[in-house]
UniProtKB/Swiss-Prot annotation:
It is a peripheral membrane protein. GO terms for molecular function: ATP binding; ATP hydrolysis activity. SMART domains: AAA (SM00382). GO terms for cellular component: plasma membrane. PROSITE patterns: ABC_TRANSPORTER_1, ABC_TRANSPORTER_2. Belongs to the ABC transporter superfamily. Glutathione importer (TC 3.A.1.5.11) family. It is an enzyme of class 7 (translocase). This is Glutathione import ATP-binding protein GsiA. InterPro entries: AAA+_ATPase, ABC_transp_ATP-bind, ABC_transporter-like_ATP-bd, ABC_transporter-like_CS, Oligopep_ABC_C, P-loop_NTPase. Part of the ABC transporter complex GsiABCD involved in glutathione import. Responsible for energy coupling to the transport system. Keywords: ATP-binding, Cell inner membrane, Cell membrane, Hydrolase, Membrane, Nucleotide-binding, Repeat, Translocase, Transport. The complex is composed of two ATP-binding proteins (GsiA), two transmembrane proteins (GsiC and GsiD) and a solute-binding protein (GsiB). Its EC number is 7.4.2.10.
Amino acid sequence: MPHSDELDAGNVLAVENLNIAFMQDQQKIAAVRNLSFSLQRGETLAIVGESGSGKSVTALALMRLLEQAGGLVQCDKMLLQRRSREVIELSEQSAAQMRHVRGADMAMIFQEPMTSLNPVFTVGEQIAESIRLHQNASREEAMVEAKRMLDQVRIPEAQTILSRYPHQLSGGMRQRVMIAMALSCRPAVLIADEPTTALDVTIQAQILQLIKVLQKEMSMGVIFITHDMGVVAEIADRVLVMYQGEAVETGTVEQIFHAPQHPYTRALLAAVPQLGAMKGLDYPRRFPLISLEHPAKQAPPIEQKTVVDGEPVLRVRNLVTRFPLRSGLLNRVTREVHAVEKVSFDLWPGETLSLVGESGSGKSTTGRALLRLVESQGGEIIFNGQRIDTLSPGKLQALRRDIQFIFQDPYASLDPRQTIGDSIIEPLRVHGLLPGKDAAARVAWLLERVGLLPEHAWRYPHEFSGGQRQRICIARALALNPKVIIADEAVSALDVSIRGQIINLLLDLQRDFGIAYLFISHDMAVVERISHRVAVMYLGQIVEIGPRRAVFENPQHPYTRKLLAAVPVAEPSRQRPQRVLLSDDLPSNIHLRGEEVAAVSLQCVGPGHYVAQPQSEYAFMRR
């Protein structure tokens, strides 16, 4: 039924008194209460808040996708102006009508493109399907339009990409495909739900700029859901702050950042890690935590030395890791991925060395190679004077007691069929360290040490939040009293407050137990806060390494400067210079089998500060 007289001029979407609830144990649990907002054509409205605040369920309610998940939605008004300028009440549309609205008039970009794309269809088929459904195009016409959309989202060699499957693309490329699919029918409203949270800073910057450019070209209203205030400052016109299912503050981006009224908004802004906040400081510093009572209160800094002088606990020399690629009629190895090329570094007890770089730079492969989770083709890995790379499997298992791993996704790291108590006890059983009674006491102590309760040991992983699951993984890593912990993107996808809690916990554990961390991350603001030293990786090689203060305050390599320049700044008045929106993905690190890559030569530019010499930077400078 048309409602053209009820939608204010300029608005493309209007919502009044939206209420969302779910049934749990025969009780109605409210997720969103009395939420009202509007969106103008060509405007970006950022909806911000922590996990559980109701951001994503609001988006799903607008798309009418909650009913399938058992959501109970009530709303006085939910009006959408379609591309045809017809105004419809979304809550009155049938399932068949909504299938025509979704994609054609409203589109959504989800946080994780790999789970949003169908793994058994090519990229081209998936984009073309939406075009054929909503524009009545033939298959050939749809594929031509799909190629045009890939060009529009600045994907190079679009014709080739059309025939590839999602797993064959990088994370940033998959997210661009999702954007192309969402925009293929030129919707009136685009909902972007955390589309850049787990992306590298350079890819994130490209995606944000891409959305702004396409929004301007299509005069499209955008709802951008995020918990990253730096992203909000860069992309938003207006901001809606949500807390525990309610809108607590709304206003222009300048009002929210420069004159926040609600204590939660002030606390959210105070908790944002600011790049450059560690200027002049030598040691890691705790994050301030979100507090409604004391929103501006800073956590006490850690200004004490934890690094132990003497011999390094871990020494890596000329590490090489390559992965074979097979092709041809005989399925022979013809090419190799040069994931890690002649990487060398030391790690001292009580030190945090951060490995930073974009996806594909070799950070995670380096971390996995240290534990021989992937086999290396060359180099030496020496732990406490003993070579790891030549150990037999039996001796390697004993050594793994001293080196533990924390993975990015805690839910995937925990067995859903085991209680968390059993998950934490498992490494103790494998190594035969403690009998049952003592192991149970150890589990209770570990849970308390990471801020959980001993009775949580009887629960299962799905009963915990993301931050709590990451604490459980940390407790399991601590069970064996390791000397080194490798944390691979351990806080990348966590909310700002949960991320601060986990980083503070890691710093406390380092202070108390002298643990050395190899911290793998692309979040430069977090790296600045936690690190003693930083190593920058590019195409499998370290191009800059040194004390955190030297690398951040005086970056020498152009790639390091690029990473720092791409970090979103939580200040609307500081707009990042406009980029040329060409593909900025890493050049290929795939080479013919047997082909050698010249190793970078590092030059000392300061105490402990080494940078790739100019002649070693040809690949970067050529881009």
